[in-house]
Every structure is written in C-alpha cells, then in structure tokens.
C-alpha cells in the first residue's frame, strides 16, 4: 500500500461508500473528504465520518465550504438573475466548491490521486472531472464509472 493517500470526495452514500474498500483492495491508502456546503442535519457530519472510518479510510476530513459556496456562487447568481435553462435559479454549482476544497486537501497531504464516486451517467462526472483537471495535475479516479464501463 502506498504511503501517499488517494483523496476521495465522500458523501457517505452508496457509491462513495463502495469506493473506499474498492480503492483499498487495489492498494490505495484512502483519505475521505466530505465538503459541507450547508444543509446537513445535526449529527449528520459525524455519521459521515463514522461511516468512512468503518469502511477503512485511514483518515476523514470535513471541510466547511458553506461560506465559499454562498460568496462565490449563490450571491452572484441570484443577484445576476442567472437561470438554468431559463427556468430555475442556477444554484447547482457546489461541485466546483467541493473540487476546490478537495484539491487543497489533496495537495496539503501530498496525495497521489483524487477520486470521486460519480457514475457513468449524468453531468456530475463531467463537473468533477473537468473541474479537477483544470485545477490540479493529479490522476482522477472514478471507480463507479470504471466498473460500469
């Protein structure tokens, strides 16, 4: 097992929970990162941490990105009247804030890769992959997508 970690964006849901042991079985030391962009119920953050450690993560980090999401995306989009497909407020941009926090943590830990649990369907995989590639040179692992291919 490598001593430098792979940093996994971790929600505690089914897909990212699968990724922890899957990555460990393939020789990765896994550090999970939950980027809290707001909206968690009391105790939920602790439950996410407990889940990550139960699954074998060597460490779990929670990053508070609520203020960054508000300042960088919500306020400007609401003030600018931005709409997704001219229908509803464009407020699904937390992936970019998550990526920024994930990369900061990965770099501070000397990580060898970053990973996410996005599937091969939908826009999340593109948001994560393109955002990650635009701000760091680390390999991007997507175990769920890879096993679906």
Specify the residue positions occupied by each region the protein language model found.
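ATP-dependent adenylation/nucleotidyltransferase module used to activate substrates
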Residues: 1-149
